[in-house]
């Protein structure tokens, strides 16, 4: 049973948002392309022979080139654990991608057709901060969840992320001690300051003429 629907546009149109005047058919074709890629890759992944692995790796690279970010979202949404792992090996950066609606790949996994715990844990182990990401409506992945087991996992990661942020040490800024002036310069400055204060020079200065003699 599907836990919660995510609009197809949010994942499949991730890499190609329609521009002004673009026909809706372009989006539909993009959606079909990503889904067919996932289905084909899932079949190829079953072949564990040397040739089969080589064919899969080659096909995966092509699919990622065509849909660098949407592919991971689609695999996560449909519970393709092994594909998620393989995609991350080749395209690690796609884990931080978002849809036009602001959905992270964790949103897609939690709200997907098969929100397998294993996929959610894989994503969180790779990028714990995903648990705090908000979509365009300000909702975190836990807001899309309907499973008590998954909710516990998400809440635990949320606490860990918050705790890490609170105990993060302040950035160390080394303090440079002030440079000391040579002793001769210090003495000279002190003498000048004292002379100005007293109103006459100390060196070679006689008593003022109007002073009383005893």
Curated annotation (Swiss-Prot):
Keyword Transmembrane attached: no
Region entry Disordered, spans: 1-32
Keywords carried by this UniProt record: ANK repeat
Source species: Rickettsia felis (strain ATCC VR-1525 / URRWXCal2) (Rickettsia azadi)
Protein name: Putative ankyrin repeat protein RF_1081
One Pfam family this sequence matches: Ank_2
Each ANK repeat, start to end: 67-135
Ranges of Polar residues composition bias in the record: 1-14
């Amino acid at each position: 049973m599907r836990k919660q629907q995510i609009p197809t546009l949010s994942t499949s149109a991730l890499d190609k948002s329609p521009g002004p005047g673009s026909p809706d058919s372009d989006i539909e074709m993009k959606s079909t392309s990503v889904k067919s890629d996932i289905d084909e890759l899932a079949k190829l992944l079953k072949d564990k022979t040397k040739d089969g692995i080589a064919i899969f790796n080659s096909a995966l690279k092509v699919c990622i080139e065509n849909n660098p970010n949407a592919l991971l979202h689609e695999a996560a949404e449909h519970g393709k654990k092994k594909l998620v792992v393989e995609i991350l090996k080749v395209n690690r950066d796609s884990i931080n991608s978002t849809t036009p609606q602001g959905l992270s790949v964790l949103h897609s996994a939690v709200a997907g057709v098969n929100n397998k715990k294993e996929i959610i844990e894989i994503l969180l182990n790779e990028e714990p901060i995903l648990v705090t990401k908000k979509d365009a409506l300000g909702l975190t992945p836990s807001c899309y969840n309907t499973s008590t087991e998954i909710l516990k996992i998400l809440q635990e990661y949320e606490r860990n992320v918050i705790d890490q942020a609170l105990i993060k040490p302040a950035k160390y800024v080394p303090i440079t001690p002030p440079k000391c002036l040579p002793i001769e310069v210090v003495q000279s400055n002190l003498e000048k300051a004292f002379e100005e204060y007293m109103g006459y020079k100390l060196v070679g200065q006689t008593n003022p003429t109007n002073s009383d003699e005893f």
